[in-house]
């Protein structure tokens, strides 16, 4: 690791339609090849689909879905005397959010619907109901941490 000071965290600007910084981070993660307008269109159209489906504010649904995906613990590899242990550690709040965003996008991309808007809307609706691939990823992460609880004294 570098011995210099850590890079400063840059603040993102809130998105144009809802004024939400987390949503901007989500769009930035969704964006491919710097095409932000495409990412925005996908998110806003997916939000319209969600709103039509369950008649709730889409930003609320988005945040509830993210809360259902955020992991509280994860495992990290630690070498101790020639053996590698999976040590459960608590996840920092910023990383929780980043992981939830990444997992939600990955799960949406792997779905079978035709357009990304449909896939994202479907994954958001599933996540709100604690179903779907992204929520399963979180459950698997928690199970791994639970299974390796015996090694938690190797925490650093």
UniProtKB/Swiss-Prot annotation:
<keyword id="KW-0694">RNA-binding</keyword>
<comment type="similarity">
    <text>Belongs to the universal ribosomal protein uS7 family.</text>
</comment>
<dbReference type="InterPro" id="IPR005717">
    <property type="entry name" value="Ribosomal_uS7_bac/org-type"/>
</dbReference>
<keyword id="KW-0689">Ribosomal protein</keyword>
<dbReference type="GO" id="GO:0000049">
    <property type="term" value="F:tRNA binding"/>
</dbReference>
<dbReference type="GO" id="GO:0006412">
    <property type="term" value="P:translation"/>
</dbReference>
<dbReference type="InterPro" id="IPR036823">
    <property type="entry name" value="Ribosomal_uS7_dom_sf"/>
</dbReference>
<protein>
    <recommendedName>
        <fullName>Small ribosomal subunit protein uS7</fullName>
    </recommendedName>
</protein>
<keyword id="KW-0699">rRNA-binding</keyword>
<comment type="function">
    <text>One of the primary rRNA binding proteins, it binds directly to 16S rRNA where it nucleates assembly of the head domain of the 30S subunit. Is located at the subunit interface close to the decoding center, probably blocks exit of the E-site tRNA.</text>
</comment>
<dbReference type="GO" id="GO:0015935">
    <property type="term" value="C:small ribosomal subunit"/>
</dbReference>
<keyword id="KW-0820">tRNA-binding</keyword>
<dbReference type="Pfam" id="PF00177">
    <property type="entry name" value="Ribosomal_S7"/>
</dbReference>
<dbReference type="InterPro" id="IPR020606">
    <property type="entry name" value="Ribosomal_uS7_CS"/>
</dbReference>
<keyword id="KW-0687">Ribonucleoprotein</keyword>
<dbReference type="InterPro" id="IPR023798">
    <property type="entry name" value="Ribosomal_uS7_dom"/>
</dbReference>
<dbReference type="InterPro" id="IPR000235">
    <property type="entry name" value="Ribosomal_uS7"/>
</dbReference>
<dbReference type="GO" id="GO:0003735">
    <property type="term" value="F:structural constituent of ribosome"/>
</dbReference>
<comment type="subunit">
    <text>Part of the 30S ribosomal subunit. Contacts proteins S9 and S11.</text>
</comment>
<dbReference type="GO" id="GO:0019843">
    <property type="term" value="F:rRNA binding"/>
</dbReference>
């Amino acid at each position: 690791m570098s011995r210099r000071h850590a890079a400063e965290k840059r603040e993102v600007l809130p998105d144009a339609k809802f004024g939400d910084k987390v949503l901007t981070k989500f769009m930035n993660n969704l964006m491919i090849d710097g095409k932000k307008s495409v990412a925005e269109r996908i998110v806003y159209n997916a939000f319209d689909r969600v709103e039509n489906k369950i008649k709730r504010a889409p930003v609320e649904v988005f945040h509830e879905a993210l809360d259902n995906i955020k992991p509280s613990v994860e495992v990290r590899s630690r070498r101790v005397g020639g053996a590698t242990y999976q040590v459960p550690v608590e996840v920092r709040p910023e990383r929780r959010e980043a992981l939830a965003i990444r997992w939600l996008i990955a799960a949406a991309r792997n779905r079978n619907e035709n357009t990304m808007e449909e896939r994202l809307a479907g994954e958001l609706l599933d996540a709100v109901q604690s179903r779907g691939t992204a929520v399963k990823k979180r459950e698997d992460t928690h199970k791994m941490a639970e299974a390796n609880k015996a090694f938690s004294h190797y925490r650093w």
